[in-house]
Amino acid sequence: LPDFTTGYFTDMRFLSLFGGNAPAVAVLAACLPVAALAQATNSSSGLAVHLSVANRFLNGTTDGHVTVMFAPEGTDPLEDTDVTSSPNLFFGMNVFGVAPAGTITMASTSIINTVTGVWGFPVVSLDDVPAGNYSVQAFFTKYEKVNRSDGSSISVHFPCGDGAPNVDGFGSLTTAILNVSITGDPQTVNLVFNNITATEAFTGKEIGGCSQGNYEDTETMKYVKIRSEALSKFWGRSMYVGANIVLPSGYDANDTTTRYPVIYSQGHWPADSGPFRYPTANFSEAWDNGTIPGENGQPDRPTPKMILVALRHETPFYDDSYAANTANLGPWGDAINDELIPYIEKNFNTIPEPYARIQLGGSTGGWESIANVIFRPDLFGACFSSYPDSLDFHRHQDIPLYTNTNAYLRPNGSAIPSIRDFENGTQVVLATVAQENHWELTFGTSSRSSLQWDVWNSVFGVQGLNGYPLEPWNKITGEIYPAAVEYWRHMDLTDYIVTNWNNSYNLGEILRGRLYVYVGSWDDYFLNEGVQEFQTRTDAAGGPGWANVTILPEKPHGGNYQDREIWDYLELVYNWIQDHGPNGTTPLPSNVTVSSSRGNNFTEVLAYGGHQAALKRQAPPSITGGDHCDGAGGCVFQGSVGRWDPGVELEAQWVVGGKPVGEAFGVAQGEALSYAPTTATKRSSIQLWVTGRKLGYVDETRKSNGIMLKR
């Protein structure tokens, strides 16, 4: 990938703004509003992509997102689409109302508009595709408009058993791969959408068709799926949640007196696999026969007898819901914990007690596992969370989110890294935060790329006025919106714990000794930084070791908890359950599993971050003053621009007698304005009109109250 300061930001449209100074571009472009970026000039090659839809591939007018990939000639564009390694050039564009047998033209312009125009990575403009030979292919992700129960309306892609990939998901329209020579002169590449990515041929008998997959039971693994009433109500359509259940050796469904603890293994889309990649992983044979082979002269020993559960909860925003109640994704926490788990406990021989329900997982699953114990200590006994996503937004990966002004740049102008490796002990940055976010934009706008940074916007943030996630920064420039970041605090798990330490939730005592967290100091995604913040702040509140935190030197992202071998890990968890059961050495007290400690209530989540909350955040402009005007000067009107979503750019206009006075002028959110009439006016009304603009939002002009000028 190109370096942040010498790669795609050296696009001539950016360099022209700053006399070709690439480092200055990197710093200053990150601070510029979109309108300023739009002033850059295009090169003149004039490359366009013309896409047509073959007959019978669309049933009606369709909205969606088109991604076109230019791969090296002879290479399948889908072979490598990863931001750290792909040789491809990616270009994306939203499309609206595409008719059956319709056409789409992708061409870059001098205006950068990710909502209606083309956005590319690692070069922004189609005009900057270097001359050469390419294999080109296009993909059309179709959106459906949905009206949610909180009054919001959005257009998204609903996955169907494919884990919500960022491109070429089930039902996508695709073109054939076309080998093209790009000349550098004006040129049009013609592609035809004449194929559909087929849904997997599922053979199971679960309800809901392909939603959340549909798999056949085996002797040792059972598949369940339910229609969630809570999710279906929120989304206004049938929504499902499923589980892959691995049974222990000797399990007998008819023996209801022998009951088993349950491990809820959180993570990404599992498809038909169980936890720990069962049944293909090496431990599977021993799990099935119930015996762990002895090593180095040690005797064989029995496998720990537990039920292992992997969850299937793909969403319109990602391959996984983060297993929590959120304003953007809906009540997935309730769907899993209040609907699916009771169904599992009704149909399998489980021990339905908190001490016997354990959460574990890594990365995304690491965050989910600890969040579920923090939010539901009444339901689960403990978590074993490995390299979890950001536990504390003082370090969101490597971004000081609460204090920095830009998500892409440090105060000294250097790029903030996102993905790294180590070679001979030296850190090697594989992608910056800017690069990864700009790459995501080619797959979807308004946090719809189905990729990592976008889903964090969906899970941690609230709804914007447009119904989509209120993004914490400008996706193009990286400018952080502090007001938007403040809405993330309710999902900052460290902040949630210390804020509710000794109030009615009493989390300081409720959670003591129940959170086990592991990360390596060389984590690929800098997740060790959030874990360190979590440890520092909880130790400050509860004393050293309040939570069981392990940070192993020089360990990267991945592996089992504390880098343990699989059986060592499973026996550790099993022993915790035995120790904390009613006959164990340290039974889990009933006063730490009380319902009053339950958090992440969906009604409160919507009240805080749903559509009605977004509406309440808004306010029109207002004016005061002018009580003693004579109409010929000598009085001053005070104006407020009103309240708008973070990131909305404002332009104000004073209006007298229904006619603009002077030129419109840019204003900042929260700015106080004043106006002194300079001409005599007979009984004219004075108003303040403010127009707000933000990518992904409808341009809107709001008008203040009117005050009469009197002579």
Residues covered by each model-derived region:
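Short beta-strand elements bearing conserved aromatic residues within extracellular beta-rich modules
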Residues: 66, 243, 650-653
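Non-catalytic cap/lid and distal C-terminal segments of serine-dependent acyl enzymes
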Residues: 72-75, 79-609
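Ser/Thr/Pro/Gly-rich low-complexity disordered regions
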Residues: 606-711
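A short, amphipathic beta-strand motif
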Residues: 47-55
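Fungal secretory targeting signals
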Residues: 1-2, 7, 11-40
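Low-complexity, serine/threonine/proline/glycine-rich extracellular segments that form mucin-like
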Residues: 59-73
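Short proline/glycine-enriched turn/loop motifs at strand-loop junctions of beta-rich domains
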Residues: 62-63, 219, 239-240, 644-649
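Surface-exposed coil/turn segments at beta-strand junctions on protein surfaces, enriched
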Residues: 42, 129-131, 184, 236, ...
